[in-house]
């Protein structure tokens, strides 16, 4: 257990992959290309999430190897920044994970391939966020690959779909995760006065939202309506990010020099 019941409540939502937590931290706190996070500050942040220093070192090694971050050393202190590649990856998903509103409505299409088309070719021709009700049927949005020019394509009335479509668009387990996240965020107490604790709360909450949201595309929002659990979690995380605003790095560095309580 940590010193904060609210932190414990968020940690109970699921195990943390340390390398992914570091990506969340770097992406949320290092907004400018020149921004860096020193090792002692990063250690304080992850210790507040129950992550030990050995696990952090392994995660940093992996992220450097995979091109996410780079390190500089000043005396005995290392600092870390996103590489241009890491920043590009972060910026690519920023409109999705920070959006406070659902995506703009666009038509959803049911696509059936021509009989002569191989199933794998059909799958390969569709966008990554396509959902497959069956091996030779697809739900997708946007323009189609020319390879599908002979496919049967029909635009769906998303207000008149059968109930079973929900379990095709997103798994029941993911829906339950979103419900638990929204409930946990809505039960958080007043923002604590300690900047380090506030920041750790922000980062854990945002990390859980980020890992859930990046597992799927826009189809759940387009098909399941405005009150599905993911939409409720999005509203809750937007409110949480306002309650626990992003700190200035200099203020956070100063807070990190205060011994942990």
Language model: regions and residue ranges:
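Short alpha-helical segments that sit at the start of domains
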Residues: 2-25, 88
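Short, Lys/Arg-rich nucleic-acid/phosphate-binding segment
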Residues: 73-79
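Short acidic, hydrophobic short linear motifs in intrinsically disordered regions
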Residues: 33-45
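Short, amphipathic alpha-helical interaction segments positioned at domain boundaries
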Residues: 87-109
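Mid-protein regulatory/catalytic core that forms ligand/cofactor-binding pockets
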Residues: 116-197
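C-terminal regulatory/effector modules of DNA-binding transcriptional regulators
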Residues: 170-261
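Short, hydrophobic-biased segments on the C-terminal half of alpha helices
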Residues: 57-61
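Glycine-centered, phosphate/nucleic-acid-interacting loop/turn motifs that mediate DNA/RNA or nucleotide
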Residues: 67
């Amino acid at each position: 257990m940590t010193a904060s019941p609210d932190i414990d409540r968020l940690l109970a939502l699921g195990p943390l992959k340390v390398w992914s937590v570091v990506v969340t931290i770097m992406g949320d706190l290092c907004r400018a290309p020149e921004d860096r996070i020193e090792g002692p500050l990063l250690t304080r942040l992850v210790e507040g999430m129950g992550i030990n220093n050995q696990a952090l070192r392994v995660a940093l090694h992996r992220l450097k190897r995979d091109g996410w971050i780079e390190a500089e050393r000043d005396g005995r202190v290392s600092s870390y920044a996103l590489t241009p590649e890491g920043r590009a990856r972060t910026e690519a998903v920023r409109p999705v994970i920070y959006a406070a509103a659902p995506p703009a409505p666009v038509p959803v299409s049911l696509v059936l391939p021509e009989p002569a088309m191989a199933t794998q070719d059909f799958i390969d021709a569709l966008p990554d966020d396509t959902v497959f009700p069956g091996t030779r049927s697809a739900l997708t949005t946007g323009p189609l690959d020319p390879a599908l020019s002979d496919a049967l394509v029909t635009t769906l009335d998303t207000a008149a779909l059968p109930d079973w479509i929900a379990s095709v668009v997103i798994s029941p387990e993911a829906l339950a995760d979103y419900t638990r996240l929204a409930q946990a965020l809505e039960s958080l107490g007043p923002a604590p006065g300690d900047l380090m604790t506030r920041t750790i709360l922000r980062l854990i909450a945002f990390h859980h939202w980020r890992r859930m949201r990046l597992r799927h595309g826009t189809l759940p929002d387009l098909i399941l309506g405005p009150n599905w659990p993911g939409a409720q979690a999005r509203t809750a995380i937007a409110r949480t990010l306002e309650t626990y605003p992003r700190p200035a790095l200099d203020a956070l560095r100063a807070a990190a020099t205060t011994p942990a309580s």
